[in-house]
């Protein structure tokens, strides 16, 4: 009986579960790549090669999604905000503020609010391609300074892959 329960559970965890970020690991999403911070887990069930990268740490989720061809950060932001609202996880509000990463990528950032979580939506545009980065944490476990530092480091590591 134990085998009938344990084997499917272990197989499911090995295929769908979360995998710890490895030192030096780099994740590529279309024309973008970034280096996830140690201590986070790659959510293999929600992540899809070249489509979305989802990292989790406790009650915090860091999701990167390529937006395809975009002519401006403002247009890309509006599209990403609509997509986020359509998920039902919350909505993006407030006026977006300009942001520039350590590698010189530019974009905008605005707060995300919801019934169970809060965070930010950042959109970067480079080389005519857009990237949406959402960071959310459940209200029961707000962001810590260490997580905020990890997020800044990961956002600053985003770069355009040479084609």
Task: Kindly give the residue locations of the regions a language model identified.
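Short, histidine-centered active-site or binding-site loop motifs used for metal coordination
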Residues: 66-68, 136-139
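Glycine-rich phosphate/pyrophosphate-binding loop shared by adenosine-nucleotide-utilizing enzymes
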Residues: 133
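A short acidic-to-branched-hydrophobic micro-motif
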Residues: 52-79, 122
């Amino acid at each position: 009986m134990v085998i009938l329960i344990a084997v499917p559970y272990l197989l499911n965890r090995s295929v769908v579960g979360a995998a710890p970020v490895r030192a030096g690991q780099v994740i590529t999403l279309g024309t973008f790549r970034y280096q996830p911070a140690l201590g986070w887990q790659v959510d293999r069930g929600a992540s899809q090669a070249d489509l979305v990268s989802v990292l989790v740490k406790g009650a915090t989720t860091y999701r990167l999604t390529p937006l395809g061809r975009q002519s401006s950060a403002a247009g890309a932001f509006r599209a990403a905000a609509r997509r986020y609202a359509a998920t039902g996880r919350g909505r993006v509000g407030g006026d977006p503020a300009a942001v520039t990463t350590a590698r010189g990528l530019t974009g905008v950032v605005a707060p995300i609010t919801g019934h169970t979580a809060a965070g930010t939506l950042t959109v970067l545009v480079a080389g005519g391609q857009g990237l949406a980065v959402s960071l959310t944490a459940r209200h029961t476990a707000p962001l810590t300074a260490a997580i905020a530092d990890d997020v800044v480091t990961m956002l600053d590591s985003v770069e355009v892959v040479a084609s």
